[in-house]
Amino acid sequence: MNTVIYPGTFDPITNGHKDLIARASRIFDKVVVAVAASPKKNPLFSLEERVDLVRQVVKPFPNVDVKGFSNLLADFVQQNQANIILRGLRAVSDFEYEFQLADMNRKLAPNVESLFLTPANHLSYISSTLIREIAALGGDVTEFVDPIVSKALQQQFALRK
């Protein structure tokens, strides 16, 4: 079985993430969306909330599983009997950082490969950071995220007022 791990913070999951997951689900037998705890990033949503949102968004894809993790990605990949990490590249600026991560993961787990996909053109400018900023200021994010995520963002920011 050909299993790929797609890691990220997914705070929140965007239509760009969903596009990559949909494409990966057609390429690989199994896709594991690995939601990172990322406490240093001070996420808006808890790990449990992010895992739940991702699960709801990827429900249409039967070969996609969603798991939270807080250990090294290289270890998580091996624990899930995978040897491929999928990453999205939106712009050249993403490449340098992703290249460093790929090199480090290769050092930590020599049998693990990193595979990069570029997003669809109409999704290339979307980032979770921008989505959070727009939502925090009361902007409409429905074009960029699943309706479930849009509602969760509205609720989250309503609680903070």
Curated annotation (Swiss-Prot):
The record marks H17 as: Transition state stabilizer. SUPFAM superfamilies: Nucleotidylyl transferase. InterPro entries: Cyt_trans-like, PPAT, Rossmann-like_a/b/a_fold. Pfam families: CTP_transf_like. Its main location: cytoplasm. The keyword Chloroplast does not apply. ATP binds at T9, F10, H17, G88, L89, R90, E98, L123, S124, Y125, I126, S127, S128, T129. The keyword Cytoplasm applies. Reversibly transfers an adenylyl group from ATP to 4'-phosphopantetheine, yielding dephospho-CoA (dPCoA) and pyrophosphate. PANTHER family: PHOSPHOPANTETHEINE ADENYLYLTRANSFERASE. This is Phosphopantetheine adenylyltransferase. It comes from Hahella chejuensis (strain KCTC 2396).
